[in-house]
Design a protein with these regions (language model features):
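Short, intrinsically disordered, charge-balanced linker/junction segments flanking boundaries
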Residues: 92, 145-151
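A short beta-strand-loop-beta hairpin characteristic of the jelly-roll/cupin
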Residues: 71-108
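Conserved hydrophobic/aromatic beta-strand scaffold that supports enzyme active sites
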Residues: 47-49, 61-65, 85-87, 103-105, ...
Length: 151
């Protein structure tokens, strides 16, 4: 049996991680298994897709680190059938978030919800780093006709 050569200082499983994806069932993506993606309309942010319809989910969930000039060029999830949510996970970022005509500055623990067709825009206003969670899903009207509102 031939002995496997491993470069000194590198782990034997360099190209693997503990992430598990079972289509139409579940996904566990560990930090070392995350891939940085380019998300249209989001600038200066290292975003990772944690879940999407591509693996069977009924929603899209992103996590990312915002750079000093992070901002959106178009509102995230602004289609007529999409509702969205943003949450500032951690960091010292001051994030100006726009939902329609309303703007607020969010810090760690802050969040905003945008009803369908409105979308969420954001801009890092203090140049500090922070992490965010972005979420969007298809809007399903309430059976009694109640309308959602921005939070």
């Amino acid at each position: 049996m031939e002995k496997e050569f491993i470069m000194p200082g590198y782990p034997a499983d360099l190209l693997s991680n503990r992430s598990i994806v079972k289509r139409d069932s579940f996904a566990i993506i560990t930090p070392e298994g995350r891939v940085i993606n380019t998300i249209p309309g989001i600038v200066d942010a290292k975003m990772t897709i944690l879940c999407s319809p591509k693996i069977g989910a009924g929603f899209v969930q992103l996590i990312g680190t915002l750079g000093a000039n992070a901002h959106t060029t178009i509102p995230y999830a602004n289609l007529a059938h999409e509702e969205s949510f943003i949450y500032v996970l951690d960091g010292t970022v001051e994030l100006e978030v726009a939902v329609g005509d309303e703007k607020r500055v969010l810090t760690q623990g802050g969040y905003a919800y945008a009803p369908a067709s409105v979308g969420i825009g954001f801009k890092n206003v203090n140049g500090e780093e922070g992490r965010i969670l972005l979420y969007k899903q298809r809007y399903v009207p309430h059976p009694a006709g109640l309308e959602p509102y921005a939070v």
